[in-house]
């Protein structure tokens, strides 16, 4: 029997995300062409520990039912450790299952049980940004720019007057943390005054366009 560890699963998630992209070429795993997906938002699926939040063991318990629907692939919304400001899309650690859903071992068990039933499992990989609580971001904000994660984010001391205006407008709003307007966040970190975000202020954009790719 073939077993899978968490790194294998994350690699598969990245592959699926690439293959399903809007501009993807007809490449990738052969099974994807005939896949019939069943999407699960884990928080609202089956809860096995009575805390009111769905979890991975709950999904595993329902695999026979899912199989009976005629699907052959699962798509799980984000399950990685998260600050949970944006329903799991503010990832703290891409290598750890959020405790609300279970453990890394629970994820491996789910994948193995799904594969026994001919069901593939794809994870929603949040590839554009992380949480500002992510260890990568905390290292990147340091003054030393030669650290491993220094260039994982986009920092600057100079932004346009319009960008400054958008920051001020967010600050004056009723809930600045939930305001998605604008491009930059005022950080006043050792590294620089501002960082680029994707959506909310707590979601610093990952840097795909500069030096030192990992």
Across the structure, where does each feature detected by a protein language model lie?
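Bacterial N-terminal signal peptides that target proteins for export
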Residues: 1-10
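Hydrophobic h-region of N-terminal signal peptides that target proteins for export
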Residues: 13-22
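Acidic/aromatic-lined carbohydrate-recognition and catalytic surfaces
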Residues: 25-212
